[in-house]
Structures are given as C-alpha cells and as structure tokens.
From Swiss-Prot:
Residues 21-31 have a biased composition (Gly residues). SUPFAM superfamilies: Ribosomal proteins L15p and L18e. It comes from Francisella philomiragia subsp. philomiragia (strain ATCC 25017 / CCUG 19701 / FSC 153 / O#319-036). The lineage of its organism: Bacteria, Pseudomonadati, Pseudomonadota, Gammaproteobacteria, Thiotrichales. Part of the 50S ribosomal subunit. InterPro entries: Ribosomal_uL15 (IPR030878), Ribosomal_uL15/eL18 (IPR021131), Ribosomal_uL15/eL18_sf (IPR036227), Ribosomal_uL15_bac-type (IPR005749), Ribosomal_uL15_CS (IPR001196). This is Large ribosomal subunit protein uL15.
Length: 143
C-alpha cells in the first residue's frame, strides 16, 4: 500500500450538491432557497430561539430554582459499594484513597441501596436511617 493509492471505500462519499446550475439539476435558479424572504438572502437567518418577533418561549416561561454550589462537594455512596472495599474503618480520606470518591469531596453520605455483607465502621460519615440499620445488622457500627 502506498499513500497515493489510499482511497475511501466505494459508495462512502457522495458528490457535493451543485447549486444554481440549471433547471435540469433540480437545484437551479433559486438553489433550493425558494423565493425571496430573509432565509433566501446571503447571510440571512435568525437567532436560535427567535420566533418571528413573538415573545420567545424561554422568556415567556418563569425562572425557577437554583443550583447550590456546596452540593458539588458532597458525595453519595450506595451501601453495596462498601462491599468492594478492603477496609474495616471507613473515613472520607480512605474513600478518596480507594478512588470511590473524587479528591475535592468534603463530606459523604451513605444511602441504603443494595446490601452490605461485611462489618464496617464508619467514622465522620453521615448515613440514612436505613443504611445505619443495615450496617449495624451486618455487625458494623456508625460513629
């Protein structure tokens, strides 16, 4: 194989539409743009969301809610994810070291999703009522 012999697969490329090249082409005269109007002009189009002067939907509907910036630094961990850890004592730092949470996370909450088979001790980690019951049932403790 040589560089000058490389070609795309047969049928994978189509010839570009040749606009304004006579009636027989099917795209002559107005080149598929119809007659007159803003969209027929060169450079003529509207902004995204423009509705012809009518008040656009993004301005008709009210604003609501906001995103808390502190939420970015709180992680949720499911109960069954603790099974994969080779740790008896679980803290925020040990979770960071194991790669279960990002390094910039400041606090963690365990939620009762799935089951836990091993006894673990949680230190400085919040958990839901159901998760606490499951951890204590498995022989672990929450501090």
């Amino acid at each position: 194989m040589k560089l000058n012999t490389i070609a795309p697969a047969a049928g994978s490329k189509s010839a570009p539409k040749r606009l304004g090249r006579g009636i027989g082409s099917g795209l002559g005269k107005t080149s598929g743009k119809g007659h007159k109007g803003q969209k027929a002009r060169s450079g003529g189009y509207h902004k995204v969301g423009f509705e012809g002067g009518q008040m656009p939907i993004q301005r008709r509907l009210p604003k609501f809610g906001f995103t808390s910036a502190s939420k970015r630094y709180v992680a949720e961990i499911r109960l069954h994810e603790l099974n994969g850890l080779a740790l008896e004592e679980v803290t925020v730092d040990t979770l960071k070291d194991s790669g279960l949470i990002r390094k910039d996370i400041k606090s963690v909450k365990i939620i009762a999703s799935g089951e836990i088979q091993k006894a673990v001790s949680l230190k400085g980690i919040a958990c839901t009522k159901g998760a606490k019951e499951a951890i204590e049932k498995a022989g672990g403790k929450v501090e």
